[in-house]
Every structure is written in C-alpha cells, then in structure tokens.
Amino acid sequence: MAKTFVISDTHFNHAGILSFKDYIGKPVRDFDSVEQMNEAMMDNWVSVVGPKDTVIHCGDVLFGMDKADWMARNFDKLPGKKRLVVGNHDNLKILAPFFRDMQLWIDMSDKGLLFTHTPQHESTLAESHRFGSKPLLNVHGHIHTNPSPEGPFKCVCVEQINFTPVDIEELI
C-alpha cells in the first residue's frame, strides 16, 4: 500500500547552512561538505520512500547556485510523487517541473493534518477545521532546530527528523 511521507527544509545544495549554529552553538547540520549533506538526505529519502509513495515537502527545497541544473541532475532520482508546500526560499519557476503540484498549504483534514511551511496561528487552525470532527495538527517546517509553538504543531524540518522523510501515519 502506498504511503505518504513529509519532510521540510532540505536546503539541498546550500553550503552556507553548514556554518549555522543552534542556540547553544552546536552546528545545525554536522556534515563536512554540502555534497555529503545532499548525499545523506538523498540516501535517507531512498531508504524509506517507494516509487508509489507520495512525499509532501513543506518548503525550502534547495538553495545556492545552479539550482535548475542541480534539480535536473538529482531530484528525479528520488522516488515518490512529490508535492510542494511553497517555502520562503522556493523558486517556483525552477521547482515546477519536479513537483506534481505546488500549494501554499495542503489540507488533509480527513486525517486531522494541515501542512504549511511556517507554523500557523492556533486560531487559524481552529477556524479552518470548524466543520470537521478532528482537531488539526499543523505539520510545518521553517524553524529548523527551534521548537514548535505550544499546541497542535509538529516540525518536520530535516534537523528534527534525522534528515529522513516521516510517514504521516506516525503523526496521526
């Protein structure tokens, strides 16, 4: 049976992110090079996602120079049907050929999930789900190693999910 996975803020090809530190001074991505980081995330993706699965990417797919070339050489090697929730660093013109669809959010209220790039205000979550039977869990990215706000939030930035897509059934 096909599964649905989620991941966010891969920042493929973003060499600068390797120098970022968290609030206690620890590197947010402990890799020796951008190539090692890219390879680790791609290997992790391939290890859990099958060709019939779907992957919701909650934004900030890649960064840096030669984005279109990097996507053409690498992204199609990753299995699964890819859906994008647009992030603040995403170039839609470059990314469009590689995603089945691109949205500002994906509402799976039948499963109690709302996928966004940034955490939404709790009142937005309550309002968007007032006719349903399940409360919405806001599955989001953007904040990297920072904690999600209190309440119905789950960050799926790669730094918080061991650089590996997560099966949404684990979130429900």
Predicted regions: what is each one?
Residues 2-8, 12-108:
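Core catalytic region of metal-dependent phosphoesterases/phosphodiesterases
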Residues 97-172:
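Conserved beta-sheet core of the metallophosphoesterase superfamily
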